[in-house]
Structure formats: structure tokens, C-alpha cells
Amino acid sequence: MNKFNYGIRIPIANNVVIPVNKIGRGDVVVFAYPENESVSFIKRIVALPGDTIEYRDKKLTINCQPVPKTPKGNDEYIENTPMGQVNMQPIVLEEKLGVHTYPVYQLPQAPTFSPQVVRPKVLQEAACQYEGNVAFTCKVPAGHYFAMGDNRDNSDDSRYWGFVPDKNIVGKAF
């Protein structure tokens, strides 16, 4: 991880004092988990401050522009359940966001997201509107980012716990 890629920060407050590079769409970053800042998370930044993000029927749109995806094939995906193992075949897509191209894994039979695990504070924020388990739209507030995992149907990310504050950014993953 490069702690200085996005700037030199003041310790403890974690405010940038000497900016270096800006966080870009598609960057993979390490950050302090907003619900427990002693835990580090690594996710892909898909939306920047001021962006409007829509995720509908597993299709990502940023500022009314669809994020390009092309099929790449299937990979084996195994998920443990209380009843044993279930073997499912995800669709592997190649997504292009900003200057980054990367694989995204989706399970065709899984919902777009699971509203029952969206944290109450996220549901109360006026920044996001949810439509059952098929779609949501969010306006990213100033000083925050929207992060998603590449394993889209099995990722604990901004869909569930909200935006990543800039002060929580630790650095860029290599």
C-alpha cells in the first residue's frame, strides 16, 4: 500500500496537508471501515464526491453514464452455508472505470443487493433512495467516496454501510 499516493496527512486527524494525487474512479484503496475505524478495508472507489451513482439490475451507472462491462467467462465460486457447500458459477465481467479495467464477479441468481442488511443510518440519509432489492441511487456528498467490492454479490461495501469519508483513506493499494 502506498500511504503517500493521495498526499501527506497529519497523524491522528488524518487531514491532507500536502496533496499529491487525487483519488480516481476505479482506484483500489485501503481505508478505515466507517463503522469501526480500527478495522482496515480494501475496496474499489466507484464514485467520487458530487457523483450520482445508480446500481440497477446489476448495472452500474455514474452520472447517467453506464460503466462499460464485457463478459469474460465463468469461474468456480464456492460459498459455505449452514447446510454445507453450495457450488455456483458466477459470471465474470470485465469492467472499465476511469483508467482501470478489472474483473467483476456476479452471481446471476443473487439480488442486486440485500436491503435487509443496509444499516439504518444509511436508510435515513437523504443521499440514497432504494427500490426493493433491484436498484438504488445515491448522490455522493462532498468529502466522501462510494466503494464497492469486485465480488459484487458477496461484498460488504458502501451499499450497506454508506460513504467512505476522505479522512478514513489510508492509501492506495498496489
Model-identified regions with their sequence ranges:
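Soluble "head" domains of membrane/secretory-pathway proteins
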Residues: 1-174
